[in-house]
Regions:
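PRPP-dependent phosphoribosyltransferase catalytic core
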Residues: 117-206
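Short, glycine/charge-rich flexible loops or terminal/linker lids adjacent to PRPP-binding catalytic cores
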Residues: 55-99, 107-117
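Active-site-facing substrate-recognition patch
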Residues: 1-28
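Short glycine-rich phosphate-binding loop at a beta-alpha junction
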Residues: 27-36
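Alpha-helix termini
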Residues: 24-26, 50-59, 88-92, 120-127
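Structural beta-sheet core signal
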Residues: 66, 101, 132-134
Length: 206
């Protein structure tokens, strides 16, 4: 498996360019839903961009909200998604509202599919009024079936033709789990030695 360390400023810059593309495409959201935790950094940036656009171009404020969902396996080893809650419940959405649903990555896609289906079913929202936005889009070409909901906007797309081609993307904006001692030294301690006392007792081949 390929492992990539993705700098936070790369995500920031890509998110700004993607937000501009969404706007240029004529899609102005009423609500930006951030899928927590992974989508927070990218969604914050997109929300800020639309806040500026709303002020300059005199359109409606864009509500920023969050949703917490998690995947788990039941006794039959079927993966299911449980939604813990929404900071702005879908029941409050109005007919015609436009939605951006933002996450860091589309991997298995189960969580995104569950969230979009919940939005569509709870308020009868058409799919075209919901745009799925991710930084990284993994498309597994060897899967026999693809989930119905796929990203509408993404910064990078990886077509993965075999399990060996899969990649682990480490988002340096918020992730710490799974770091080796060598990775800590290269990506964290080298730039800021004070982090040695902060992280080394708990991470790095423990």
């Amino acid at each position: 498996m390929i492992k990539e360390f993705l700098e936070y400023d790369t995500v920031r810059n890509n998110a700004l360019k993607l937000a501009n593309k969404i706007y240029k495409d004529g899609f102005i959201p009423d609500v930006i839903y951030c899928s927590l935790r992974g989508g927070a950094y990218m969604a914050n940036i997109i929300s800020e961009y639309f806040k500026i656009l709303a002020k300059v171009n005199k359109f409606h404020p864009v509500l920023y909200a969050g949703v917490v969902a998690r995947s788990y396996s039941d006794v039959a080893q079927h993966t299911k998604v449980f939604i813990d809650g929404w900071t702005y419940p879908p029941e409050n959405l109005r007919p015609g509202d436009k939605i951006l649903l933002v996450d860091d990555i589309f991997d298995s896609g189960r969580t995104i599919n569950c969230l979009v289906e919940t939005l569509m079913n709870s308020r009868g929202m058409p799919r075209e009024d919901i745009k799925v936005v991710v930084h990284d889009y993994k498309y597994f070409t060897y899967y026999n079936e693809q989930l119905p909901i796929q990203p509408d906007y993404y910064c990078r797309k990886f077509e993965i033709n075999s399990p060996e081609e899969n990649r682990w993307i480490h988002y340096m904006s918020h992730e710490l789990v799974g770091l080796s001692k060598k990775e800590l030294e290269e990506y964290y301690f080298k730039d800021d030695p004070e982090l040695i006392d902060v992280l080394s007792p708990y991470l790095g081949d423990k």
